[in-house]
Design a protein with these regions (language model features):
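Jelly-roll (double-stranded beta-helix
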Residues: 1-287
């Protein structure tokens, strides 16, 4: 389930996803993600990963805009970045110390009525607890929320164009999360920086445009979302390839999700659809 959310007020309830991990990308704003295991201060361009079954709430300090992916299982670091012992390899695009764990606060010793909304299998239940969910004196283990900032991602570059899968950042059952980060372009003397036309027959492609200039797209601005369904041929719009020649770098930041099961569009999305988007591939006549 992929959506966007805007948080302007502290959450008055606690939320627990019992169906899988949640991945929240912070487009704008700052604040604190609270959980029984402690607090994580977040800022713009943070990925917040909340494991399945962990209750949390957001306490924004400023208006917080989110791109949200509710997964059907665990969000993991791709296996190709890990050695047999789980340590990150040297070619991974980040380091263990780039991930921020919760800071355990003092136990919240309070009784009353505390609403916990639990989501699982397409349904939501409400539990009212007598004791505060954050009344925790300590914890142990490896299942806890983490934060990672996209600005700490070290993108892979190459002599020739790198396919999108090169820029994978996380994986989950049926999905690959990709980050198009600011980077140098291909450095072969005759390289064409713009991506080639392609049809991804195995997945639907979602891209959320966070910041910068995404060179292969026209009519895209910050917070735009595109969906290219499996099998639909797409690529640079007319003029984008020519405009990319000679470029040495990009400042784009875009969060992408490759979904390996067909996506169904929710009814509210149609009200904000750019019905003319497909026409952006029509060449503009010069007079």
């Amino acid at each position: 389930l992929i959506s966007t959310a805007t948080v302007t007020q502290p959450m008055e309830y606690f939320f627990r996803n019992a169906g899988g991990d949640e991945l929240l990308f912070v487009q704008a704003g700052d604040g604190v993600l609270e959980s029984p295991l402690g607090d994580i201060a977040y800022r713009a361009h943070d990925y917040l990963i909340v494991p399945c079954g962990i209750a949390y709430r957001l306490q924004p300090r400023s208006k917080t805009e989110l791109f949200v992916a509710e997964c059907s299982g665990t969000v993991e670091i791709p296996e190709k970045f890990r050695n047999p012992f789980g340590q990150l390899k040297e070619h991974a695009p980040y380091y263990e110390r780039d991930f921020r764990a919760p800071d355990l606060r003092e136990p919240h010793d309070e009784q009353g009525e505390f609403e916990v909304r639990i989501s699982a299998r397409g349904r939501t239940a409400i539990h009212v607890m007598q004791n505060h969910p954050f009344d925790v004196v300590g914890w142990d283990g490896y299942c806890y929320p983490v934060a990672f900032n996209a600005d700490d991602y070290a993108p892979v570059t190459g002599k020739l164009h790198q396919p999108p899968s090169t820029h994978v950042i996380f994986e989950a059952p049926g999905a690959a999360f990709i980050l198009f980060a600011p980077r140098h372009f291909d450095y072969h003397p005759q390289a064409v920086p713009a991506p080639y036309n392609h049809a991804s027959v195995d997945c639907d492609e979602i891209i959320y445009y966070a910041s910068g200039n995404f060179m292969s797209r026209r009519g895209i601005e910050e917070r735009s979302i595109t969906l290219h369904a499996a099998g639909a041929v797409h690529g640079p719009q007319p003029g984008a390839v020519e405009a990319s020649l000679g470029k040495t770098a990009t400042d784009e930041l875009a969060v992408a999700v490759d979904c390996f099961a067909p996506l169904r569009i929710a009814e509210p999305a149609f009200s904000i659809e750019d019905a003319g988007y497909f026409r952006s591939w029509v060449a503009v006549s010069k007079t």
